[in-house]
Amino acid sequence: MAHGVDRTRRIGEQMRRDLAQALVDIVHHPHASLLSFTAVHLTRDLSFAKVYVTHVLDNEEERSELVAELNAKAGQFRHYLAKNLSIRKVPELQFYYDQSVEYGARMEQLLTHLVKDSEHKD
């Protein structure tokens, strides 16, 4: 059981690295070079992959546009992966914006604010 999980994680990490390399050739968006693939979560049977990305853009509309372009070019990414991965069937890809970095920054900001408030009360 654990062996299957390790294999899935290992393949996901390899996919993440390969997708980053393919990005420059496939996506011709002006801000594509500022994009990072943060994680790939695969189903146990390797038929489907959720690919999480982050971007330094603050503009929600541009981020949505970029993720939509990634999803539109999922077939090209799959073709690239098929040439580079040693697996029988390349999973279907779905791209999502990873909000965890922003969420973490917001939590840190709130905690800092709480600490400052408690220092002022003392």
Swiss-Prot record:
Entry-linked InterPro entries: KH_dom-like_a/b, RbfA, RbfA_dom_sf, Ribosome-bd_factorA_CS
UniProt keyword Cytoplasm present: yes
Pfam families attached to this UniProt entry: RBFA (PF02033)
Keywords for this protein: Cytoplasm, Ribosome biogenesis
GO MF: ribosomal small subunit binding
GO cellular component: cytosol
Keyword field contains Glycoprotein: no
Cell compartment(s), UniProt: Cytoplasm
Biological role stated in the UniProt entry: One of several proteins that assist in the late maturation steps of the functional core of the 30S ribosomal subunit. Associates with free 30S ribosomal subunits (but not with 30S subunits that are part of 70S ribosomes or polysomes). Required for efficient processing of 16S rRNA. May interact with the 5'-terminal helix region of 16S rRNA.
Family classification: Belongs to the RbfA family.
Quaternary data: Monomer. Binds 30S ribosomal subunits, but not 50S ribosomal subunits or 70S ribosomes.
Protein name according to UniProt: Ribosome-binding factor A
Encoding gene, per UniProt annotation: rbfA
